[in-house]
Amino acid sequence: SEMCIRDRKDIQEDVETLHSKAFDPLGLSTDTTLDSSGAHKMRSGKEEHLYNPQTIHLLQLATRTGDYKTFKEYTALVNKEEGVKNLRGLMNIKFPKKGISIDEVESVDSIVRRFKTGAMSYGSISREAHETMAIAMNMLHGKSNSGEGGEDIDRLKVGPDGLNRCSAIKQVASGRFGVTSRYLVSAQEIQIKMAQGAKPGEGGHLPGKKVYPWIAKTRLSTPGVALISPPPHHDIYSIEDLAQLIYDLKNANKNARISVKLVSEAGVGTVASGVAKAGAQVILISGYDGGTGAAPRSSIHNAGLPWELGLAEAHQTLTMNGLRNKVVIETDGKLMSGRDVAIAAMLGAEEFGFATAPLVTMGCVMMRVCNLDTCPVGVATQNPELRKRFTGKPEYVVNFMRFIAQELREIMADLGIKTLDELVGRTDLLEQKNVAKSGRSAEIDLSQILDNPYVKQTKIHYDKKNVFDFELEKTVDEKILLKKFESAMETGSKRSLEIDVANTDRTLGTLLGAEITRRFDDKLDDDTYTVKCNGAGGQSFGAFIPKGLTLELVGDSNDYFGKGLSGGKLIVYPPTGSTYKEDENIIIGNVALYGATSGKAFINGVAGERFCVRNSGATAVVEGTGDHGCEYMTGGTVVVLGKTGKNFAAGMSGGIAYVLDEDTSLYKRVNKQLVSMEAVSNKYDVLELKQLITEHVAYTNSKKGKEILDNFGEYLPKFKKIMPHDYKKMLNMIVQMEEKGLSSEQAQIEAFYAATK
């Protein structure tokens, strides 16, 4: 209770100090101008930062000259004991009297394979910065992370110059930007981002002025229109849903490790245990010091916890539940030195992510304008003129990673430890040091982190023989589809097949689709391979299927139908003799076509909630939808031949929806914040609508579709065209630029500049 009172007194004093600076209740003419404390942007003589002019200069000098001695000067400043800035600053490493020769320690080349660069999207940082990190990490056989913004197709294979610009880790975030079959197949590791260290609970946000045409092309969105990822993944509302997404992604690339990114928080150990049971091979515990570039300041300074807390809890909880040797634990969040990595390993980490430090080696000077597109060194900007100032090279990032590994080896040699695996979980080599005589630091107790009852267990790191078994050999794809289509894929000839399915056949068609992508990219003609399925489709039917593959389902399907559709075609209709009315028969479940990027879907029945959420480019025809249809949509075309649920088109910033409004009540159910609702009058719109309904009837034999086509003149006035304001404005501007004689590409650029001035 005494400690509690003292803590409250500290807090009270802080509040009173700030209050007295902001108010003058007695009218004493006190200057209430608030001076900058330097908490966010560094100010001379104010709050100290680990990245300051001195450390930034030394780090850049060391990595650009390849001088390890200068790097040691940098880490000496970072690790100095005065003014503790993080929890690891309160820890001592307990060295024995005698270590071992550094020649006996695991090599630099081996250690750097455990290093990764953090998830920074192409869009938040420049192409030059993004590619430089990818090249560097591929040179080291480590891994770079694409972030959530997709990746240009020309980077997915080794370039003509022999450089590999492909990010080994492909991230799948709630926005699903650029998540295609090709994107997933190119990955060595696929990371599901549940949250971000600096802003847990918030979705990603790319301001409109950073959505240049080339970014919009990669993300399949509209230039100049801000991109906001939903706060949750709409296919993850429970741990079972997460297990389903992990399974989907394993089917989309059976050779990739599946990783789940969590944020350090109280209780993260319980979540990590669930994630391990769900089949993830890597669990990332992200600290609050990371990912601060464009996060809101309120989140940067008030949300998240240090990685030391979450990492220790996750490691101990997984060990306690007998799950530790099934997964790799990774951590990130301002790892700056070999000492930081050593302590992270002792607390339970086996792999390590770096983000800010590689940016600094490439030229970042911590101007804190990442979200403004005004980065003066060409790192966090898309502005072509500012990008010319980029001076980074892959060699600088390589030097940084190798220097970190070398410093780590020196610590391991002094500890008498030969391999990094032997260091994992060795909290007995750490102790709390008493550097603070007063203030809150003096009250900190690290015993829950350091007193690990499982520390004497030697096998407390990942062992590949314990990896989760997805039993893919039992899937319909492996047992039937891949075998039946093998000869056709070898020759590129057309082939069709008819099979029976049950709702236990999850993620049907995805393994086959991934193999088609590996062999043909997206170059096949439509309907090259067709599978007619009779029965009930399971979860994630047709997820991520590519161009050339058609799945025709006579029956119904569960949730996540057509998730991430990547050019394939999906057709669903009830069996002959069905007595249900199509516009009253819910034939597919919730969250269909989530994150679809291209392809077509024709559904002779009603879809559940969140139909086409985050659709980026697919075309779909359906006979009705549940609530929140077309939510967060950025591209593509949707035709609804019946009623929608409430909140239709919420967050929709691109694409077009045509909705049949027979009782003129649609206006009550549309979220009008971002969209307009108008009659279908443009001749091109009329032609498009009629063509899509014609295709729908041809594929599904829809009675409603036939009736509309037979009486098209009568039904046309009942259709409403729903289109986002900004999307419409941008398309009109592009047309105006093209009328001036500009090419399509140049017209987009000029329209973007005109819209974002």
For every predicted segment, state its role:
Residues 10-168, 227, 426-434, 439-558, ...:
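Terminal or standalone catalytic/regulatory effector modules within metabolic enzymes
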Residues 7, 186, 191-223, 348-442, ...:
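Mobile "lid/hinge" segments at catalytic clefts and subdomain interfaces of large enzymes
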